[in-house]
């Protein structure tokens, strides 16, 4: 299947922007992210003729690999995790721009070695001094890596040098502020691309178009018509091989502070003055500044955690979180988190936003659901079917699309109603598959477009919102007090209470 960017019917309709020749250096190049996501996305852009022929990719990691071995590993990744190599001629052309440099993240000599190597490649490949440095490494390597890049003078050009930082950006408000200070000590904000791959998903990007390009919806997008909003990111997988990271992170750090808060911002923000990076990010910061936990004095009314226990997934038994390899048998790390947020502004005053995420849930699904208020007078009370409130749901994954639920009369002589859905699907409407999120984000970074990347103050405001719950959950607690939910179910009973006490209920997806 072709992707949106290679749709043959679009050829010649408009000129696609192509980045300037540059060198993309990936730190942590021997890791899964590089092989599974980054290089396959770059190769797909090459297939779509979106990249200059001079584009050069340099892998940087501790392993003592040769250029050829790095190329072999990246080819395996493209064949296994993407659409395949396609033309051998195209692959050979692409491989000529793949290089490898071994070194340590905290070793100054490694950076001088890298700097000299990039200088040689710059002359050989004619990349004109343009550099992108991608930190696809463990978060504890962010500060030393950024400092060493600065000390080596590789971030000194505010126009030609950029740095991409993967999530998580800090583990709390204090560490995020500290990391921002490190970044700001060596480069300017316009050089920094804090990446959240959820912002590269088509449905997420379409949310602003849906809201601000259609007169029918935005007038209803407020407290007058909206009863509440639910944002769900559910995963079927367990902790898998990430126990070392997950034990120190948990669901709130891993998913809520970044992915769910970004979805929240795009749902709740006011219209920007223009579709550019600063205008959009200004509005996201404004709505975060107006956001608070529903009950700061009684956190049980604002946040619920949980942890999966042994259960069944796809007809097979799976272990509980505490039984996973590498996990403390008495761990109180949450694998489920639910928050109730309130926004103190004219648009949303009194409208609750319910956020939830968890591992080992029945389905892998991400959705934003806006539930509208019930009609003021139910004139069809004599009808056997009880009228349901209208719900607008935006499906981020799987099957990207939008659905509107409403009431309709059933065929026949009697007045009977039924709840029906009006659906929009990307696949069926455009006849193309949505491009991978990293595809769009990498291209935007190469083009110097920061619209889909988070700004320093935005990151800090998101941490501020969740900090009270985070502090409470980080405090030592009795393992027996941790709410549990069976693998293959939606959430612990306590999370049901969080929304049921308001006369509402979680959507069953």
From Swiss-Prot:
Name of the encoding gene: zwf
Annotated residues for binding of substrate: 197, 201, 235, 254, 359, 364
PANTHER family cross-referenced by the UniProt entry: GLUCOSE-6-PHOSPHATE 1-DEHYDROGENASE (PTHR23429:SF0), GLUCOSE-6-PHOSPHATE 1-DEHYDROGENASE G6PD (PTHR23429)
The protein's name in its UniProt record: Glucose-6-phosphate 1-dehydrogenase
PROSITE patterns named among the record's database cross-references: G6P_DEHYDROGENASE
GO cellular component terms, semicolon-separated: cytosol
Keywords: Carbohydrate metabolism, Glucose metabolism, NADP, Oxidoreductase
Function: Catalyzes the oxidation of glucose 6-phosphate to 6-phosphogluconolactone.
């Amino acid at each position: 299947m072709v992707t949106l960017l290679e749709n043959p019917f679009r050829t010649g309709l408009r000129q696609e922007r192509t980045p300037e020749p540059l060198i993309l250096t990936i730190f942590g190049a021997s890791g899964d992210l590089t092989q599974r996501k980054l290089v396959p996305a770059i190769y797909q852009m090459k297939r779509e003729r979106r990249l200059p022929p001079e584009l050069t990719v340099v892998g940087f990691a501790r392993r003592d690999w040769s250029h050829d071995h790095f190329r072999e590993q990246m080819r395996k990744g493209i064949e296994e995790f993407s659409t395949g190599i396609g033309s051998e001629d195209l692959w050979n052309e692409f491989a000529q721009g793949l290089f490898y440099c071994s070194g340590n993240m905290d070793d100054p000599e490694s950076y001088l070695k890298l700097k000299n190597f990039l200088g040689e490649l710059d002359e050989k490949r004619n990349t004109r001094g343009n550099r992108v440095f991608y930190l696809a490494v463990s978060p504890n390597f962010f500060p030393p890596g950024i400092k060493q890049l600065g000390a080596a003078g590789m971030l000194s050009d505010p126009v030609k040098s950029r740095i991409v930082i993967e999530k998580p950006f800090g583990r709390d408000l204090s560490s995020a502020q500290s990391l921002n200070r490190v970044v700001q000590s060596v480069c300017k904000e316009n050089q920094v691309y804090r990446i959240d791959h959820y912002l590269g998903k088509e449905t997420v990007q379409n949310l602003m178009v849906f809201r601000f390009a259609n007169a029918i919806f935005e007038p209803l997008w407020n407290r007058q018509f909206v009863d509440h909003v639910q944002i769900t990111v559910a995963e079927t997988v367990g902790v898998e091989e990430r126990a070392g990271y997950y034990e120190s992170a948990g669901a709130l750090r891993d998913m809520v502070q970044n992915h769910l808060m970004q979805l929240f911002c795009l749902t709740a923000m006011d219209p920007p003055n223009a579709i550019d990076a600063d205008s959009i990010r200004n509005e996201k910061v404004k709505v975060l500044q107006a956001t608070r936990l529903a009950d700061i004095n009684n956190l049980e009314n604002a946040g619920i955690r949980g942890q999966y226990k042994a259960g069944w997934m796809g007809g097979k038994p799976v272990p509980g979180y505490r039984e996973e390899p590498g996990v403390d048998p008495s761990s109180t790390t949450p694998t489920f988190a639910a928050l109730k947020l309130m926004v103190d502004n004219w648009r949303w005053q009194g409208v609750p936003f319910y956020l939830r995420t968890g591992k080992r849930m029945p389905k892998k699904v991400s959705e934003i659901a806006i539930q509208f208020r019930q009609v003021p007078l139910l004139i069809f009370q004599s009808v056997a079917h009880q009228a349901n409130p209208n719900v607008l749901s935006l499906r981020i994954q799987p099957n990207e699309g939008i659905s509107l639920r409403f009431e309709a009369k059933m065929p026949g002589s009697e007045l009977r109603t039924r709840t029906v859905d009006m659906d929009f699907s990307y696949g069926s409407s455009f006849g193309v598959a949505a491009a991978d999120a990293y595809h769009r984000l990498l291209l935007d970074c190469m083009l110097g477009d920061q619209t889909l990347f988070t700004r320093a103050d935005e990151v800090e405001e998101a941490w501020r919102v969740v900090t009270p719950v985070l502090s409470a959950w980080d405090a030592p607690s009795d393992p027996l007090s941790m709410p549990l939910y069976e693998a293959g179910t939606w959430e612990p009973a306590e999370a049901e209470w969080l929304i049921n006490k308001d006369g509402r209920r979680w959507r069953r997806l």
